[in-house]
Protein backbone atom coordinates (compact mmCIF):
# COMPACT_ATOMS: atom_id res chain seq x y z
CA UNK A 1 0.00 0.00 0.00
CA UNK A 2 1.35 3.43 -0.97
CA UNK A 3 0.55 6.62 0.91
CA UNK A 4 0.94 10.02 -0.67
CA UNK A 5 3.42 11.72 1.68
CA UNK A 6 1.71 15.03 0.96
CA UNK A 7 -1.53 13.62 2.41
CA UNK A 8 0.28 12.42 5.55
CA UNK A 9 2.05 15.78 5.85
CA UNK A 10 -1.23 17.66 5.36
CA UNK A 11 -2.82 15.62 8.16
CA UNK A 12 0.12 16.31 10.47
CA UNK A 13 0.09 20.04 9.66
CA UNK A 14 -3.68 20.33 10.11
CA UNK A 15 -3.44 18.62 13.49
CA UNK A 16 -0.57 20.89 14.48
CA UNK A 17 -2.58 23.99 13.49
CA UNK A 18 -5.56 22.92 15.61
CA UNK A 19 -3.16 22.26 18.50
CA UNK A 20 -1.71 25.73 17.91
CA UNK A 21 -5.20 27.22 18.23
CA UNK A 22 -5.57 25.32 21.51
CA UNK A 23 -2.20 26.68 22.64
CA UNK A 24 -3.24 30.31 22.11
CA UNK A 25 -6.74 29.79 23.51
CA UNK A 26 -5.12 28.55 26.73
CA UNK A 27 -2.38 31.19 26.59
CA UNK A 28 -4.91 34.03 26.44
CA UNK A 29 -7.21 32.51 29.05
CA UNK A 30 -10.12 31.72 26.74
CA UNK A 31 -9.65 28.11 27.81
CA UNK A 32 -8.40 28.00 31.39
CA UNK A 33 -7.28 24.99 33.45
CA UNK A 34 -10.83 24.29 34.64
CA UNK A 35 -12.31 24.37 31.13
CA UNK A 36 -9.43 22.25 29.82
CA UNK A 37 -10.09 19.64 32.49
CA UNK A 38 -13.80 19.62 31.62
CA UNK A 39 -13.01 19.21 27.91
CA UNK A 40 -10.65 16.33 28.73
CA UNK A 41 -13.45 14.64 30.65
CA UNK A 42 -15.83 15.24 27.74
CA UNK A 43 -13.42 13.46 25.40
CA UNK A 44 -12.56 10.67 27.83
CA UNK A 45 -16.10 9.94 29.04
CA UNK A 46 -18.26 10.78 26.01
CA UNK A 47 -16.84 11.56 22.56
CA UNK A 48 -14.00 9.01 22.54
CA UNK A 49 -16.14 6.05 23.72
CA UNK A 50 -18.86 7.04 21.23
CA UNK A 51 -16.29 7.23 18.41
CA UNK A 52 -15.02 3.76 19.30
CA UNK A 53 -18.53 2.27 19.36
CA UNK A 54 -19.71 3.96 16.16
CA UNK A 55 -16.58 2.87 14.29
CA UNK A 56 -17.31 -0.74 15.26
CA UNK A 57 -20.94 -0.45 14.18
CA UNK A 58 -19.91 0.83 10.74
CA UNK A 59 -17.77 -2.25 10.09
CA UNK A 60 -19.42 -5.13 8.23
CA UNK A 61 -19.31 -8.33 10.26
CA UNK A 62 -17.45 -10.81 8.07
CA UNK A 63 -14.99 -13.61 8.76
CA UNK A 64 -12.18 -11.56 7.19
CA UNK A 65 -12.92 -8.45 9.26
CA UNK A 66 -13.15 -10.49 12.46
CA UNK A 67 -9.83 -12.11 11.61
CA UNK A 68 -8.25 -8.66 11.10
CA UNK A 69 -9.47 -7.46 14.50
CA UNK A 70 -8.05 -10.58 16.13
CA UNK A 71 -4.72 -9.96 14.41
CA UNK A 72 -4.73 -6.36 15.68
CA UNK A 73 -5.05 -7.58 19.27
CA UNK A 74 -2.09 -9.93 18.84
CA UNK A 75 -0.05 -7.27 17.02
CA UNK A 76 -0.78 -4.73 19.77
CA UNK A 77 0.34 -7.22 22.40
CA UNK A 78 3.54 -7.84 20.44
CA UNK A 79 4.21 -4.11 20.00
CA UNK A 80 3.77 -3.40 23.71
CA UNK A 81 5.96 -6.33 24.79
CA UNK A 82 8.66 -5.29 22.31
CA UNK A 83 8.34 -1.66 23.45
CA UNK A 84 8.90 -2.80 27.05
CA UNK A 85 12.08 -4.65 26.06
CA UNK A 86 13.27 -1.86 23.76
CA UNK A 87 12.58 0.80 26.40
CA UNK A 88 14.36 -1.14 29.13
CA UNK A 89 17.49 -1.65 27.01
CA UNK A 90 17.64 1.74 25.26
CA UNK A 91 17.11 3.74 28.46
CA UNK A 92 19.96 2.05 30.35
CA UNK A 93 22.09 5.07 29.40
CA UNK A 94 20.16 7.06 32.01
CA UNK A 95 21.58 6.60 35.50
CA UNK A 96 18.98 8.57 37.48
CA UNK A 97 16.17 6.15 38.38
CA UNK A 98 13.17 8.46 38.01
CA UNK A 99 14.28 9.79 34.62
CA UNK A 100 14.99 6.26 33.44
CA UNK A 101 11.66 4.74 34.41
CA UNK A 102 9.70 7.72 33.07
CA UNK A 103 11.63 7.47 29.80
CA UNK A 104 10.82 3.76 29.61
CA UNK A 105 7.17 4.57 30.23
CA UNK A 106 7.32 7.21 27.48
CA UNK A 107 8.66 4.67 24.99
CA UNK A 108 6.03 2.03 25.79
CA UNK A 109 2.83 4.05 25.92
CA UNK A 110 1.74 6.04 22.87
CA UNK A 111 -1.07 8.57 22.56
CA UNK A 112 -3.24 6.12 20.62
CA UNK A 113 -6.64 7.70 21.22
CA UNK A 114 -6.12 11.47 21.48
CA UNK A 115 -3.47 11.76 18.76
CA UNK A 116 -3.63 8.45 16.91
CA UNK A 117 -7.34 8.35 16.09
CA UNK A 118 -7.36 11.49 13.91
CA UNK A 119 -4.43 10.15 11.89
CA UNK A 120 -5.68 6.61 11.28
CA UNK A 121 -9.21 7.88 10.64
CA UNK A 122 -7.85 10.11 7.87
CA UNK A 123 -5.62 7.39 6.40
CA UNK A 124 -7.72 4.25 6.89
CA UNK A 125 -11.27 5.52 7.49
CA UNK A 126 -13.63 3.98 10.05
CA UNK A 127 -11.75 0.70 9.77
CA UNK A 128 -8.65 2.46 11.07
CA UNK A 129 -10.61 3.78 14.07
CA UNK A 130 -11.80 0.24 14.86
CA UNK A 131 -8.24 -1.07 14.53
CA UNK A 132 -6.93 1.67 16.82
CA UNK A 133 -9.70 0.94 19.32
CA UNK A 134 -8.69 -2.72 19.49
CA UNK A 135 -5.04 -1.70 19.68
CA UNK A 136 -5.90 0.47 22.70
CA UNK A 137 -7.39 -2.48 24.62
CA UNK A 138 -3.90 -3.93 25.09
CA UNK A 139 -2.62 -0.41 25.82
CA UNK A 140 -4.98 -0.05 28.79
CA UNK A 141 -4.26 -3.54 30.15
CA UNK A 142 -0.51 -2.98 29.79
CA UNK A 143 -0.69 0.50 31.35
CA UNK A 144 -2.28 -0.79 34.55
CA UNK A 145 -0.02 -3.85 34.81
CA UNK A 146 3.49 -3.52 33.40
CA UNK A 147 3.26 0.27 33.45
CA UNK A 148 2.67 0.17 37.19
CA UNK A 149 5.62 -2.20 37.63
CA UNK A 150 7.92 0.23 35.79
CA UNK A 151 6.83 3.25 37.83
CA UNK A 152 6.81 1.20 41.04
CA UNK A 153 10.53 0.43 41.01
CA UNK A 154 11.94 1.57 44.33
CA UNK A 155 8.46 2.45 45.60
CA UNK A 156 6.11 0.58 47.94
CA UNK A 157 3.03 2.75 47.37
CA UNK A 158 2.41 1.97 43.68
CA UNK A 159 0.23 -1.12 43.26
CA UNK A 160 -1.51 -2.96 40.45
CA UNK A 161 -5.28 -2.49 40.14
CA UNK A 162 -7.22 -5.36 38.55
CA UNK A 163 -10.39 -3.26 38.52
CA UNK A 164 -8.71 -0.54 36.46
CA UNK A 165 -7.18 -3.15 34.15
CA UNK A 166 -10.62 -4.49 33.24
CA UNK A 167 -12.89 -1.47 33.70
CA UNK A 168 -11.75 1.72 31.98
CA UNK A 169 -12.95 4.05 29.25
CA UNK A 170 -10.94 2.20 26.62
CA UNK A 171 -11.96 -1.40 27.21
CA UNK A 172 -15.65 -0.86 28.05
CA UNK A 173 -16.61 0.90 24.76
CA UNK A 174 -14.58 -1.71 22.88
CA UNK A 175 -16.61 -4.49 24.51
CA UNK A 176 -19.86 -2.67 23.67
CA UNK A 177 -18.62 -2.14 20.12
CA UNK A 178 -17.71 -5.82 19.75
CA UNK A 179 -21.20 -6.90 20.83
CA UNK A 180 -22.86 -4.47 18.39
CA UNK A 181 -20.42 -5.52 15.66
CA UNK A 182 -21.51 -9.15 15.92
CA UNK A 183 -25.18 -8.17 16.28
CA UNK A 184 -24.87 -6.29 12.98
CA UNK A 185 -24.05 -9.60 11.33
CA UNK A 186 -27.49 -10.96 12.21
CA UNK A 187 -30.55 -10.66 9.99
CA UNK A 188 -32.13 -7.59 11.56
CA UNK A 189 -35.38 -6.27 9.98
CA UNK A 190 -34.75 -3.27 7.75
CA UNK A 191 -37.62 -1.38 9.41
CA UNK A 192 -35.82 -1.53 12.76
CA UNK A 193 -32.53 -0.38 11.24
CA UNK A 194 -34.16 2.60 9.50
CA UNK A 195 -35.80 3.57 12.78
CA UNK A 196 -32.36 3.79 14.41
CA UNK A 197 -30.93 6.07 11.70
CA UNK A 198 -31.45 9.16 13.86
CA UNK A 199 -29.62 7.55 16.78
CA UNK A 200 -26.71 6.62 14.54
CA UNK A 201 -26.54 10.17 13.19
CA UNK A 202 -26.45 11.59 16.73
CA UNK A 203 -23.60 9.22 17.59
CA UNK A 204 -21.77 10.36 14.46
CA UNK A 205 -22.04 13.98 15.61
CA UNK A 206 -20.78 13.16 19.11
CA UNK A 207 -17.92 10.99 17.84
CA UNK A 208 -16.93 13.72 15.39
CA UNK A 209 -16.20 16.05 18.31
CA UNK A 210 -13.44 13.78 19.61
CA UNK A 211 -10.65 14.87 17.27
CA UNK A 212 -10.95 18.69 17.39
CA UNK A 213 -11.54 18.82 21.15
CA UNK A 214 -8.68 16.45 21.96
CA UNK A 215 -6.28 18.45 19.77
CA UNK A 216 -7.35 21.74 21.37
CA UNK A 217 -6.73 20.24 24.81
CA UNK A 218 -3.33 18.89 23.76
CA UNK A 219 -2.32 22.29 22.43
CA UNK A 220 -3.43 23.94 25.65
CA UNK A 221 -1.39 21.51 27.75
CA UNK A 222 1.78 22.69 25.98
CA UNK A 223 1.38 26.13 27.57
CA UNK A 224 1.84 24.57 31.01
CA UNK A 225 5.27 23.15 30.16
CA UNK A 226 8.57 24.88 31.00
CA UNK A 227 9.60 25.95 27.48
CA UNK A 228 13.25 26.59 28.35
CA UNK A 229 13.60 23.11 29.80
CA UNK A 230 11.98 21.64 26.70
CA UNK A 231 15.07 22.41 24.66
CA UNK A 232 17.82 22.01 27.27
CA UNK A 233 17.59 18.34 28.27
CA UNK A 234 19.52 15.80 26.18
CA UNK A 235 17.45 12.96 27.65
CA UNK A 236 14.31 14.30 26.00
CA UNK A 237 15.95 14.43 22.56
CA UNK A 238 17.18 10.87 23.05
CA UNK A 239 13.69 9.69 24.04
CA UNK A 240 12.21 11.46 20.99
CA UNK A 241 14.71 9.77 18.65
CA UNK A 242 14.11 6.30 20.09
CA UNK A 243 10.34 6.72 20.47
CA UNK A 244 9.45 8.51 17.23
CA UNK A 245 11.99 7.18 14.71
CA UNK A 246 14.05 4.13 15.69
CA UNK A 247 11.37 2.07 17.44
CA UNK A 248 8.54 2.48 14.87
CA UNK A 249 10.83 1.72 11.93
CA UNK A 250 12.04 -1.48 13.61
CA UNK A 251 8.39 -2.39 14.27
CA UNK A 252 7.54 -1.82 10.60
CA UNK A 253 10.37 -4.03 9.36
CA UNK A 254 9.42 -6.83 11.75
CA UNK A 255 5.70 -6.54 10.89
CA UNK A 256 6.27 -6.56 7.15
CA UNK A 257 9.18 -8.94 6.66
CA UNK A 258 9.05 -11.23 9.70
CA UNK A 259 5.36 -11.41 10.61
CA UNK A 260 4.28 -10.78 7.00
CA UNK A 261 0.95 -9.19 8.00
CA UNK A 262 0.66 -7.16 4.80
CA UNK A 263 1.60 -3.63 3.75
CA UNK A 264 -1.51 -1.88 5.06
CA UNK A 265 -1.51 -3.44 8.52
CA UNK A 266 2.28 -3.08 8.78
CA UNK A 267 1.94 0.65 8.04
CA UNK A 268 -0.87 0.95 10.59
CA UNK A 269 1.25 -0.83 13.21
CA UNK A 270 4.21 1.45 12.55
CA UNK A 271 2.06 4.57 12.89
CA UNK A 272 0.71 3.28 16.22
CA UNK A 273 4.26 2.61 17.41
CA UNK A 274 5.46 6.05 16.24
CA UNK A 275 2.84 8.16 18.01
CA UNK A 276 3.92 10.63 20.71
CA UNK A 277 3.97 9.70 24.38
CA UNK A 278 0.58 9.26 26.01
CA UNK A 279 -0.57 11.91 28.46
CA UNK A 280 -1.05 8.96 30.82
CA UNK A 281 2.69 9.15 31.56
CA UNK A 282 2.32 12.71 32.81
CA UNK A 283 -0.85 11.83 34.72
CA UNK A 284 0.87 9.01 36.62
CA UNK A 285 3.94 11.16 37.25
CA UNK A 286 1.72 13.83 38.81
CA UNK A 287 -0.23 11.27 40.80
CA UNK A 288 2.83 9.58 42.30
CA UNK A 289 5.13 12.62 42.34
CA UNK A 290 7.76 11.13 40.00
CA UNK A 291 9.39 14.20 38.41
CA UNK A 292 6.15 15.48 36.80
CA UNK A 293 8.07 18.27 35.05
CA UNK A 294 10.24 15.76 33.20
CA UNK A 295 7.18 13.66 32.30
CA UNK A 296 5.29 16.71 30.99
CA UNK A 297 8.32 17.74 28.95
CA UNK A 298 8.55 14.26 27.44
CA UNK A 299 4.87 14.31 26.45
CA UNK A 300 5.15 17.84 25.05
CA UNK A 301 8.33 17.33 23.04
CA UNK A 302 7.28 14.00 21.51
CA UNK A 303 3.95 15.58 20.54
CA UNK A 304 5.61 18.55 18.83
CA UNK A 305 8.29 16.49 17.06
CA UNK A 306 5.80 13.84 15.91
CA UNK A 307 4.29 16.36 13.49
CA UNK A 308 7.53 16.03 11.51
CA UNK A 309 8.55 12.45 12.36
CA UNK A 310 5.28 10.75 11.37
CA UNK A 311 5.47 11.86 7.71
CA UNK A 312 9.20 11.05 7.79
CA UNK A 313 8.82 7.45 8.98
CA UNK A 314 5.96 6.85 6.52
CA UNK A 315 8.26 8.08 3.74
CA UNK A 316 11.15 5.88 4.92
CA UNK A 317 8.89 2.82 5.31
CA UNK A 318 7.72 3.14 1.71
CA UNK A 319 11.32 2.81 0.54
CA UNK A 320 11.27 -0.86 1.58
Show where each model-derived region lies.
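Alpha-helical transmembrane segments of multi-pass small-molecule/ion transporters
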Residues: 1-320
Amino acid sequence: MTFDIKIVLDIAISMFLVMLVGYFLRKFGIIDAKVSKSLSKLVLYVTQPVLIVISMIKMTCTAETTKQLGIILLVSLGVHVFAAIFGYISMKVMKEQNARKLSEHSIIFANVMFFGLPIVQSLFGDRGVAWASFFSVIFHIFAWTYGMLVLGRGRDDIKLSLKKVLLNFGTIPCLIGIVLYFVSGLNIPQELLSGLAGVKKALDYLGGLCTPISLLVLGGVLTTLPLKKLFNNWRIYYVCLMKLVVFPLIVYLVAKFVLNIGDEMSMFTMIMAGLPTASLTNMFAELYDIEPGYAATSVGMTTVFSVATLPFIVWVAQLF
